[in-house]
Amino acid sequence: MEKNYIYTSNHGYELDVTIGKFAEQANGECYIKSGDTSLLVTAVASEKPREGIDFFPLICDFQEKLYAVGKIPGGFLKREGKASDEATLISRQMDRPLRPLFPENYYNDVQVIATVLSMDEDHLPDCLSTIGASIALGTSDIPFDGPVAAVSIGYVDGDFVVFPNEEQRKKSELDLTVAGSKDAINMVEAGANELNEAQMLEAMLLAHEEIGHISDFIQDIINEVGKEKNLVEVVVASELEEKITSDFAEDIKSSIRTTDKMERGEAIFNIEEAAKEKYLEDYPESEDEIHRVIDDIMKKEVRRMISIDKIRPDGRDLKEIRPLSAEAGLLPRVHGSGLFKRGQTQVLSVTTLGSPADVQIIDGLNREEIQKRYMHQYNFPPFSVGDVKPLRAPGRREIGHGHLAERALVPVLPDASDFPYTIRVVSEVLSSNGSSSQASICGSTLSLMDAGVPIKKPVAGIAMGLIKEEDSISILTDIQGLEDHLGDMDFKVAGTRDGITALQMDMKISGITREVLEESLANAKEARMQILDLIEATIEKPREDISDYAPRLFTIDIDPEKVRDVIGSGGKTINKIIDETGVTIETEDDGHITVASTDGASGKKAIEMIRAIVTDPQVGDVYTGKVTRIMNFGAFIEIAIGKEGLLHISQIDHARTDKVEDVLAVGDEVTVKVTEIDKQGRINLSRKALLEKPEREDKEDYKNNSKAEAWPADEDPRNK
């Protein structure tokens, strides 16, 4: 039965939710609208749990349908294909707040699909997809401890804005998305233009206040039309669990204190193998349980060490950063490189500079194509964690980490008008023991500065963690992999000395107070300053010049009406410039032209050729042109593409010239001066006006060259 619900916010937006209209065979569904943006969100679970796994198999998919904005997909097939990076990021944004709210021992496959059916630019579908997923799951029979909601916050002209529209987003200093329940924030994603910690905290709390109102709205829907939830089998401590704990707990606790990740992993592996050898005969098919029990013992001990002993597995105190090292300029032929190491996490970042023609063009749910001039790509090869796996295309995690690092650095990049290069940074994770995304931010700062990119300020990132045991809360600075896996929070903060540029948080528990968030941000700032000290000690400021192997860019702004003159009929003119100089040329409708060359001389020559095309010659101007034709009375010189002037025989030299061919040949370059432009626009040139006049030994030799000789108009080929 179809039901409709409407939520009207005090902040000026509306949610329109319909249940029971679409997708009747899904476990749960909702049709959600805001403005002209509408999505169908479905939730489906398998009937039985998947066997042999120790993780929850949740899949969240965000589908962009170009018909939603009245566009036909490009390409030969004319249909949507692989998910775009934007769709992947929104899929992750749905997954992160939903995943912690399923029962711990629930192993049924669950798929949530959010399909964009219609969209306007003022109402983005990202937060709507999370809200819709919460409604679909909450009203279904799938076990889910919701509701949750998501809210976006902007910062425009000194004020925070809830769900900013398109115009406000263009001016906003903040792009913040917060998701959570009425009682807790459990996901944050943000890019900011150096907002301080107090401003970020205020924005997060404003978002959470609105999340509470939306959660109440969702709960009302669930109370009215929600299905009875399926039961989840409760796992009780088994006899085997008690035996493993009794026989191996002390060995496990001892191995946890091994500071080296690989040695610790080997020690735990040996314990697990010993447990299997001891128990599998009496407890066949219990391999998964043995692994789970050992993991639980590790988790309890790590959390006890941190909460009670205030010491971490690698011996650090709670606020201590792992050993740091940094290096810039280590690769000789690339445009820029930086190596950053924090503990056993090591990232190599490499910068490549390209012309404006190298921008990434993105065609998605936008009225117009998006052109990205800065790209940050993150790679996580299997050897970085000692694994053997086939190499695949970048997954969701790689795309998400690359996006986070990209957001962190965008605010400090120079304007395109000051530095017109397209910039690509690739971060290669060479070794990972936690916080590799933040290490990629630090490595990228080093790499950009080494490449001569005039970034406004260096950027660094740090990952914070948290362990909450009853009333004891321990905030951790610079978490390693084990603390991330067994802890309650992963809070990544990146920024400059003056403020935050990117932030990402995933919280596994509720009950985190304002004071805890405040302290986490303060500790992150303190750590960030230490890392920035190292970066600035490694490379104090961006290199004065770009690499010898990077393209040289030259720009010129011309009258937009003359762009067609530079291009020429069928591209003839611009192709001639390219052929003669070996450059690449990018023209824009507003008259801005960019020339890219492998050396400065070619670029400067191309710019001069363009300037000559669009500039009307004036008497007194000097050009270096090419001889195109020779006549008995002089030579025609191309001073610019499509512009010729006559160099009369009397203007070739101070001495008498009997034959033009004695001095010039077709194809010769000659420097000439404009001496006259007649009423018909014909250009007369002189070479001798630029030559030093010698002392005359034979006055007759110079007599006939004292002035240009006239010729009948009908003999001038420029009139034919």
Residue ranges and their predicted role:
Residues 142-258, 448-544:
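Mobile "lid/hinge" segments at catalytic clefts and subdomain interfaces of large enzymes
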Residues 551-553, 560-720:
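Single-stranded RNA-binding regions, centering on S1/OB-family and related RNA-binding modules
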Residues 28-30, 123-141, 328-351, 433-453, ...:
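Conserved phosphate/anionic-ligand binding catalytic regions in large, soluble enzymes, centered on
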Residues 26-111, 116-123, 189, 330, ...:
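Glycine-rich, flexible beta-strand/loop modules in the N-terminal catalytic cores of phosphate-handling
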Residues 1-46, 54, 229, 233-369, ...:
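Extended amphipathic alpha-helical scaffolds
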Residues 228-238, 530-556, 604-624:
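Long, charged amphipathic helices and adjacent flexible linkers at domain junctions
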Residues 1-232:
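Long, basic N-terminal domains or extensions that often function
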Residues 104-110, 145-147, 214-232, 262, ...:
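Flexible, glycine/charged-enriched surface loops at secondary-structure junctions
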